[in-house]
Amino acid sequence: MRSRRDNSWVVQKFGGTSIGKFPDKVAEIVKSARLGGDRPAVICSARSSGKKVFGTTSRLLQVYRTLRGIVAITQDPDMQELLFDRLRSIIKDIRDDQVATVQIYILRQDIRDETTRQITADCQELLDYTSAAKRFNLDINGKAKDKMVSFGEKLSCRLMVAMLRDRDIPAEYVDLSDIVPNNNLNHLKPEFFPEAAAVFGKRIEACNGRVPVITGFFGAVPGSLIDSGIGRGYSDLCAVLVAIGLHAERVQIWKEVDGIFTADPREVPDARCLPSITPSEAAELTFYGSEVIHHLALSLAIQAKPPISIFVKNVQKPWGQGTVVVPSDGDDTSSWPIDYLDPSDSDCTSSTALPKMPTAVTIKRDITILNILSNKQSMSHGFFVKVFTILAEHDISVDLISTSEVHVSMAINSSNMDPSQIKDVHCKIAEEGEVNVLPDMAILSLVGAELKNMTGIAGRMFAILGEQHVNIEMISQGASEINISCVIPDKDATRALNMLHNELFTKNAM
């Protein structure tokens, strides 16, 4: 069994809420790692001190949307000025919030003053960019969105560098937002990731003993980081790319919970923390509603040589083991640092003595079902091509699909859609057949690598829901055989989640 090397890199990614609510705890975790013989590389998400909608990234997206509105109404300068005043106010709020945090947490006056100047300069740069876009009527596209959103991670890094320096830990600000050479490609290709990892590693190694504090936002990504297949959650991916570039074997994802749970503990009080989970299970949970780890981060971590172990840990309980993402039987485990997992030091429940059961149950809200009855006597490949082309034109992806001879049902995520999009899609698909739209739905998913070996588990799941009079609109079982999903009314989602967890997890563990 291999032991962990002293002075080896460990990549520590801290979520926006952790940095927003517990910056002192974050700094102490990094300091402890360094004093303990590790070489921490710190990835920062944009700060958020409460709900995500009020976080820095959400505010910056407000700036982006406001700027788009300004550029779109060049014929109305009075309205432009009104909107620009609103935009300027949002940026001022961001700046004031960041500076107030510096004043609270940084003890040394010289570091406070320097960090305040840096934050003010960053916010002025953002304001100057938006002013130039307004003046010269620039194209406010995905690249522009990336540029504006990247300031959130920059500001977080300014704070964390100051927090570490305030504790006599030498630290260096590392901006990855525009470090990858722009190859003018419009589409993200697989070779982008190893190239980016190499560039990241080279830049971070240049810190020469100082703790690198790294922007979780990275670029330039072909097309756009936000609007490409990466999207929100990119800082997880950044952490894994940094680990690959540094040949690190450990990534720690720090959150405000003990690890990954059998269900969302905010909705299911008796949910248990899992000591370990496979990458496939983690990816399914992420896709179907649980904010676990970005799916591309999981994929790249397992493909790395040696594979990278990912720990999900609680920033408020740094001594806890948390949940480790370990490879399944089909993965190459020859170089996996398995000795890092010590169940005796874990807040998470050991599953070694438990009967065979699913791994977790999750819910994904803001789902709309499209039921389409073909106006032909039988389906054809042309029908599906037309339907999916219409969805693609509106940037709509399908979460679940169920088909019969002349009928297709699709569950789509409508969280970022306005009613006009649904109406437009409805009208266009109606040319191909009869369309019925069911809003306010939710996907309920049972996830587990052992599901394929659990005879009758699907029947038991649906029987539990039926006994409690929960109507099922759609049923789907993934080709991977580790997920069984159904679509139910959103009003029944929390009740159904608790019923399934109680019957399949709590009672099973007694």
UniProtKB/Swiss-Prot annotation:
It catalyses: L-aspartate + ATP = 4-phospho-L-aspartate + ADP. It is an enzyme of class 2 (transferase). Pathway: Mycotoxin biosynthesis. GO terms for molecular function: aspartate kinase activity; ATP binding. Belongs to the aspartokinase family. InterPro entries: AceGlu_kinase-like_sf, ACT-like_dom_sf, ACT_Aspartokinase, ACT_dom, Asp/Glu/Uridylate_kinase, Asp_kin_monofn, Asp_kinase, Aspartate_kinase_CS. Fusaric acid is phytotoxic to plants such as cotton and banana. It has been shown to induce programmed cell death in plants. In addition to a mild toxicity to animals, fusaric acid exhibits acanthamoebicidal, antioomycete, and antimycobacterial activities. GO terms for biological process: homoserine biosynthetic process; lysine biosynthetic process via diaminopimelate. It comes from the Eukaryota. Keywords: ATP-binding, Kinase, Nucleotide-binding, Phosphoprotein, Repeat, Transferase. Disruption phenotype: Strongly reduces production of fusaric acid. Its EC number is 2.7.2.4. Residues 372-440, 446-510 form the ACT domain. It comes from Gibberella moniliformis (strain M3125 / FGSC 7600). This is Aspartate kinase FUB3. Induction: Expression is positively regulated by the fusaric acid cluster specific transcription factor FUB10. Expression is also positively regulated by the secondary metabolism regulator LAE1. One of its GO terms (cellular component) is cytosol. PROSITE patterns: ACT, ASPARTOKINASE. Aspartate kinase; part of the gene cluster that mediates the biosynthesis of fusaric acid, a mycotoxin with low to moderate toxicity to animals and humans, but with high phytotoxic properties. L-aspartate is suggested as fusaric acid amino acid precursor that is activated and further processed to O-acetyl-L-homoserine by cluster enzymes aspartate kinase FUB3 and homoserine O-acetyltransferase FUB5, as well as enzymes of the primary metabolism. Pfam families: AA_kinase, ACT_9.
